[in-house]
């Protein structure tokens, strides 16, 4: 039983810190390196983890198996099946990275990503947690939530990630009201300074947000014209997904709100 518990602790820490090496993991879980190494090898054999480089010196990351299991548990496979064709159309119209995220445990979790063809792009790993108050996807979901859920979140600490992160509850209330009115949220370097995004909430049959859809762009490439175009595109795409799921309109007056996408980091590809 202890070996199973150790393996689960290691799995949790890899998910939180990936990519991560054995020494850092051992310090984090307060276990001997030999114990951590055995757990890693067991999890690799079971298909839960993989190494980013060959040999024991490689750093460890999750495979897609935990994400797939989570989708089965929460019904996200159905959401993804509906969303991906819409995301592909959206990416084709804007040629920027498109993210799909779902609310979970006071955050939003990235479950799908379609990348732009442009050499500088936003890269976030699947399974990444994004804060509700400092990401476009998060704000989209939060603005579409019930007043009670919003107030519950606003009573908690709102961590500052960059100089532009909104950490004042009253200021965030005002922004959420604006998101509901216009149907989309924006993020201009509030989680990562080099990332901007525009997002809208996807509403399920109950009228509650089941996901958020975002267009993510390096801040250096964002213009007022592209922001306006992205806002209309992502709002329309989120509404298409919501309608296919039997839900309503994401964030327009009379519905609920749109959101704002999470930050990441820019990467230049060859």
Range-by-range predicted roles:
Residues 149-160, 235-270:
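Cysteine/selenocysteine-centered motifs that mediate thiol-based redox chemistry or coordinate metal-sulfur cofactors
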Residues 1-81, 243-247, 268:
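N-terminal helix-turn-helix
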Residues 55, 61-156:
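Amphipathic alpha-helical effector-binding/dimerization core
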Residues 1-4, 59, 63, 76, ...:
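Short, structured helix-loop boundary elements
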Residues 82-93, 175, 182, 240-244:
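Amphipathic alpha-helical regulatory segments at dimerization interfaces
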């Amino acid at each position: 039983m202890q070996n199973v518990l150790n393996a689960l602790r290691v799995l949790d820490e890899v998910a939180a810190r990936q990519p991560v090496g054995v020494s850092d993991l051992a310090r984090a879980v307060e276990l001997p390196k030999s114990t951590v190494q055995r757990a890693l090898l067991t999890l690799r054999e079971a298909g839960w983890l993989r190494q980013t480089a060959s040999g024991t010196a490689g750093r460890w990351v999750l495979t897609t198996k935990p994400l797939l299991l989570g989708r089965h548990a929460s019904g996200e496979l159905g959401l993804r099946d509906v969303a991906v064709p819409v995301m592909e159309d959206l990416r084709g119209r804007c040629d920027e990275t498109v993210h799909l995220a779902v609310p979970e445990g006071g955050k939003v979790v990235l479950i799908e990503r379609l990348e732009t063809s442009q050499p500088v792009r936003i890269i976030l790993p699947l399974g990444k947690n994004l804060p509700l108050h400092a990401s476009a996807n998060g704000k989209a979901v939060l603005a579409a939530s019930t007043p009670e859920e919003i107030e519950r979140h606003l009573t908690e600490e709102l961590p500052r990630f960059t100089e532009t992160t909104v950490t004042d509850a009253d200021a965030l209330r005002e922004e959420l009201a604006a998101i509901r009115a216009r149907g989309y949220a924006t993020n201009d370097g509030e989680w990562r300074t080099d990332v901007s995004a525009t997002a809208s909430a996807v509403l399920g049959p109950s009228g509650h947000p089941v996901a958020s859809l975002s267009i993510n762009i390096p801040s250096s490439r964002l213009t007022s014209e592209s922001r306006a175009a992205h806002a209309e595109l992502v709002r329309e795409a989120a509404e298409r997904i919501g309608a296919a799921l039997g839900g309503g309109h994401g964030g327009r007056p009379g519905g609920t709100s749109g959101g704002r996408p999470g930050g990441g980091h820019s990467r230049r590809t060859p």
